[in-house]
Amino acid sequence: MSMNPIADEMNHLIGTAREFQPQYREMYRELSDTVVRREYARGGQMLHRGYYCPSPVYDLIVGGVKRGRLLKRLPSAKSTPDVTFGFNEKDQLVTVERSGGGKEFIFYPEDGLELGIGFMSDRVCLVSECRFAQGRLQTYSCCYLAHGKDFHKEVFAYDEEGLRYLDWYTFCEYDNNKTSYEHEKYQFEHDEDGTLSRYRAVPCDDPFLRERKGLSQTMEAPFSVYDMEFEITQKRKV
């Protein structure tokens, strides 16, 4: 166990990837057999699962990242969708297939828990975990393993209006054994109809950032950033 709990969570997902490495193809076939409905999308290549990214706000905060759009018509023989989504009879998303060859299967081992295993080129390259309570997403974690180890986690806090705070963590281990760690916090506001209207960065008290032991850590944003508000133009209720 490391001194950083976020690093421990990353290592937990890496262990999950190793656990499923010998059987990922078989599990993908089994879950593919449960698909009763498919949806198709364009765009969203830069986002985990594209249109159905588990994070409700990732594309609102990260510039240049879009969810893409669902196609209203089935693709023709001359037209290949960027992403194909498969749903089971419970209307749960169970498979994701990208035109570039990457695939992912999603399963639900217990109530309130969703696990995703992504693979490409004969190896597991992505593991994700979502935890829900009372119908709301509480945490979303994702670890990319294609080049080094890139871990991302979002922790959500709600009030009577909806999403109020987001804690955003990233922890990376590179092939040269260097590491980086960041923790950002955002506060959200809503319109009268309950849709997200704006957000801003707020200070976060992270003891591990204060320690900075052995890490190449991005400095916290200057206080002037905390005075800036960013308008959300997309209508989204969270």
Which role does the model predict for each range below?
Residues 1-238:
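Buried hydrophobic residues that stabilize the cores of well-folded domains
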